[in-house]
Design a protein with these regions (language model features):
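Charge-rich alpha-helical segments
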Residues: 5-6, 10, 34, 83, ...
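Short terminal or interdomain "cap/linker" segment that borders an active site or interface and mediates
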Residues: 150-169
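Amphipathic, well-ordered alpha-helical segments in soluble domains
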Residues: 9-19, 47, 81, 131-134
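Alpha-helical membrane insertion/targeting regions
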Residues: 2-16, 27, 69-72, 76
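A mid-sequence interfacial segment
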Residues: 86-125
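Hydrophobic packing residues in well-ordered alpha-helices of helical domains and bundles
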Residues: 6, 10, 37, 41, ...
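Helix-adjacent hinge/juxtasegments
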Residues: 58-99
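Short, contiguous alpha-helical
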Residues: 26-64, 110-153
Length: 169
């Protein structure tokens, strides 16, 4: 179930980005505090990359993102990365493999927290949806010609709640 949700979120992103031009993808948007859609996408993609890097090393560190500017400026490259990450997720087993999460909230100290791959994949879905909501606002305000899936940037719990409300009325 978590794997399917992850793949669905990445497909939504891929489908949306396939409609954008490079100029739209890289344009600094006032409604996004002068960040671009590409910057939000890079941030999201790099979290997935940190997860898979951590899966191979045993320690995830989301602060150790590479901040690869190609992801925020080159749509073709980014679309290919999304496909590669989807492939990795699709081939991951739904096991709860133990892994450690390194967190650092100040300059001097860090903590190691025990977690597992599936828990972190759940976090990837929620984190992605959060950034997709911001991307959605940027597109709705600036690029009205882009078609946005009705569920893009909407939490699964909100989608279910809206469905329940529509059934009960």
């Amino acid at each position: 179930m978590t794997i399917n949700a992850s793949l669905s979120v990445l497909k939504q992103l891929h489908d949306l980005l396939a409609q954008l031009t490079t100029d739209e993808y890289t344009q600094k948007l006032p409604v996004l505090n002068e960040s671009s859609i590409g910057q939000h996408v890079r941030h999201t993609i790099e979290f997935f990359q940190c997860l898979f890097e951590g899966f191979s090393t045993g320690i995830i560190n989301y602060d150790a993102r590479k901040r690869n500017l190609l992801i925020e400026t080159n749509l073709g490259y980014t679309l290919q990365l999304i496909e590669e990450i989807s492939f990795l997720i699709n081939n991951a087993s739904e096991g709860h493999f133990p892994i450690q999460l390194k967190v650092n909230f100040d300059d001097e100290n860090f903590e190691i927290i025990e977690t597992n791959f599936m828990r972190e994949l759940v976090y990837m879905v929620e984190h992605s949806i959060h950034h997709f909501a911001l991307i959605r606002v940027g597109i709705q305000v600036n690029f009205k010609h882009i078609t946005i899936d009705s569920d893009f940037g909407v939490a699964y719990s909100t989608i279910r709640h809206k469905q329940e409300l529509s059934v009960s009325h």
